[in-house]
């Protein structure tokens, strides 16, 4: 029994040493730029530097003026595009792409015809030929 305990103890010590030495060592902290440049695999001089530019009052006013012009032009364009009222249909008929099941009246467009699908469950007025 003493031999098995001795064997287990040596196995435990071996596993402790193995786990301790198998982990990578902690990296050293780099305190100055020289050591960073020498140890780094990527050269920091390859990347372009970033420059910060402060805006002056004139540039801000120009951008505001441009924004106001854009807003006013959009408002004018929306005012110009006033929706024209549609003329009311004189006869009871079905407009294009509306449902035209058999009890419904005929299609308003003379070039359109009523097409049914799925055993006449979904019917709609469609224009078949563009030359009409």
Curated annotation (Swiss-Prot):
Recorded domain comment: The presence of a 'disulfide through disulfide knot' structurally defines this protein as a knottin.
Segments passing through the bilayer: none
Function field: Involved in the regulation of melanogenesis. The binding of ASP to MC1R precludes alpha-MSH initiated signaling and thus blocks production of cAMP, leading to a down-regulation of eumelanogenesis (brown/black pigment) and thus increasing synthesis of pheomelanin (yellow/red pigment).
Top-level lineage group: Eukaryota
Ranges for domain Agouti: 93-132
Residues spanning the signal sequence: 1-22
Keyword Protease: no
Listed GO MF terms: melanocortin receptor binding; neuropeptide hormone activity
Organism encoding this protein: Macaca silenus
Primary residence: secreted
Biased composition regions of type Basic and acidic residues, renumbered to the chain: 63-79
Keywords: Disulfide bond, Glycoprotein, Knottin, Secreted, Signal
Pfam families noted in UniProt: Agouti
Disulfide partners: 93-108, 100-114, 107-125, 111-132, 116-123
Region listing for Disordered, in residue ranges: 61-87
Subcellular location: Secreted
SUPFAM superfamilies cross-referenced by the UniProt entry: Agouti-related protein
GO cellular component: extracellular space
Residues with attached carbohydrate: 39
GO annotation terms (biological process): hormone-mediated signaling pathway; melanin biosynthetic process; melanosome organization
The protein's name in its UniProt record: Agouti-signaling protein
């Amino acid at each position: 029994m003493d031999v098995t305990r001795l064997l287990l103890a040596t196995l435990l010590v071996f596993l402790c040493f193995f786990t301790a030495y198998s982990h990578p060592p902690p990296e050293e902290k780099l305190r100055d730029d020289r050591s960073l440049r020498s140890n780094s695999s990527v050269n920091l001089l390859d990347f372009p530097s970033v420059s910060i530019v402060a805006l002056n009052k004139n540039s801000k006013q120009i951008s505001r003026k441009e924004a106001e012009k854009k807003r006013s032009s959009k408002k004018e364009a929306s005012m110009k595009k006033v929706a024209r009222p549609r003329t009311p249909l004189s006869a009871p008929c079905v407009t294009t792409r509306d449902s035209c099941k058999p009890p419904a009246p005929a299609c308003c467009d003379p070039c359109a015809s009523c097409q049914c699908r799925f055993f006449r469950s979904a019917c709609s007025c469609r224009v078949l030929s563009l030359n009409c």
